[in-house]
Amino acid sequence: MSRKLPALLALSATVSLALAGCSGSTDSASTSAASDAASTSVSQASSVTIEDNHGSVEVSLPVQRAASTDNRTFEVLADWGVPLVAAPKQLVPSSITAYDGDDVADIGNHREPDLEALAAAEPDLVIVGQRFSDQYDSIAELTPDAALLDLEPRDGESFDAELERQVTALGQVFGKEAEADQLIADFEDALERAKNAYDGSSTVMAVIVSGGEIGYSGPTTGRTWGPLFDLLGLEPALEVEGSTDDHQGDDVSVEQIAESNPDWILVMDRDAAITADEPDYTPAADVIAGNAALQNVTAVTSEQIVYAPDDTYTNESIITYTEILNSIADAFEGAQN
């Protein structure tokens, strides 16, 4: 599938040089200026072809009115100074304020999307993904003149390569190739650190704390943590048949988690990202500390618990995973000393 933005108007200029009485240096400067102008014109009229989850997408450059529905992109784009004309503001991590203004149209959330607001923002590029992946066809229908990019990590593909694929494509689209390369280098360094720090035998349990409850995040499939079991070669303390990527974790009893007696527990505090300002919010650390069934678990008694950044649930960008991997590496390295 290929969708192309309307061709940009090419700016042409005619430069007349008065050769008589001009010095050689003036000729050189004029030639250089004309060359620069031509180069700029070509750049402004160029395009880039990106291979996304639906095929080849041609994006005209420079992008003037980008919109994004993919949570994995917000921190990256904000750090790069990329403005957006529309975003699902309820889903933008609270740690990111670049898209809070009235100049950014609010397109609701994945449960109650306001795609008409997206269309009214007249984007020339829409980045579709994560919670809005199912809205791809509707978005395509309502924004026929926009290029659509869907870079959601694909099932069956290596998760690290998928994160890198996304940030590489964003770098190409927004002229931030060097910045994208640096994010990838930082991510790969963190991944290697965590791999090298793991002793290869300690058992690991991953959980999601939501609403004061502790949910199980299984190897491979579990939300946030699942792919890291494969990337780092972690030994699961417990494997449950039919585990899912449920946003609150799978319903496995805390007693069953405790009986598996993990050496390490990886924790994602879902509520920290969405309800931390509410009076009944209880931090994940307090939930775990207050759960009687877990108090004799090795990970608890040895204080071998790693917490994901507070905004992980609404972020999950390559930057978030770099932070998570470095935290895991720090913890594993500390346990060896």
Please place each PLM-identified region on the residue numbering:
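Bacterial Sec-exported substrate-binding components of ABC uptake systems
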Residues: 2-14, 18-71, 178-207, 268-281, ...
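A short, structured surface patch at a secondary-structure boundary
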Residues: 64-65, 70-117, 121, 125
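Alpha-helical, coiled-coil/dimerization segments enriched in small aliphatic residues
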Residues: 92-95, 218-248, 311
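Proline-aspartate-enriched helix->loop->beta-strand connector
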Residues: 122-128, 144, 257, 261-266
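Ligand-binding pocket segment of bilobal, Venus flytrap-like solute-binding proteins
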Residues: 198, 211-217, 234, 245-275
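Structured C-terminal subdomain patch of bacterial secreted/periplasmic proteins
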Residues: 263-337
